């Protein structure tokens, strides 16, 4: 193969675990070209490359963001393969506002 595979299933669910009720799911493939059902596959792949596949960097909160402290958890997951490496990632945000305040748009769908 000329390139390492990068194919992921991304989900957003209501609840505080990866097994939370999934509300939305998309596919994202970044090699050989960005594709899948993600609404902005090109940008999502570019952000993943820039973060070197480190999903924790993608879920960090933008500076200057203000959200209420309500506990209404939203969990995002990424499973599949990134540049040939197996991925099984999940992150729980305190509420939908915190999820929307993430630096990256990888989980914006």
UniProtKB/Swiss-Prot annotation:
Highest taxon in the source lineage: Bacteria
Source organism (scientific name): Streptomyces orinoci
Annotated family: Belongs to the protease inhibitor I16 (SSI) family.
Protein keywords: Disulfide bond, Protease inhibitor, Secreted, Serine protease inhibitor
The protein's assembly and partners: Homodimer.
Subcellular location: Secreted
Cell inner membrane is among the record's keywords: no
GO MF annotations in UniProt: serine-type endopeptidase inhibitor activity
GO cellular component: extracellular region
Disulphide bonds in the chain: 30-45, 67-97
UniProt site positions, description: Reactive bond: 69-70
Protein's recorded name: Protease inhibitor SIL-V2
Gene3D superfamilies to which the protein is assigned, alphabetical: Subtilisin inhibitor-like (3.30.350.10)
């Amino acid at each position: 193969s000329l390139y390492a595979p990068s194919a992921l299933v991304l989900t957003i669910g209501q609840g505080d675990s990866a097994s939370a009720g999934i509300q939305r799911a998309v596919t994202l493939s970044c090699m050989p070209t960005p594709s899948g059902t993600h609404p902005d596959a090109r940008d999502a792949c570019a952000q993943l490359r820039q973060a070197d596949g480190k999903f924790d960097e993608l879920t960090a909160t933008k500076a200057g963001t203000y959200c209420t402290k309500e506990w209404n958890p939203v969990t995002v997951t990424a499973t599949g393969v990134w540049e040939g490496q197996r991925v099984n990632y999940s992150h729980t945000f305190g509420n939908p506002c915190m999820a929307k305040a993430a630096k990256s748009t990888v989980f914006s769908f």
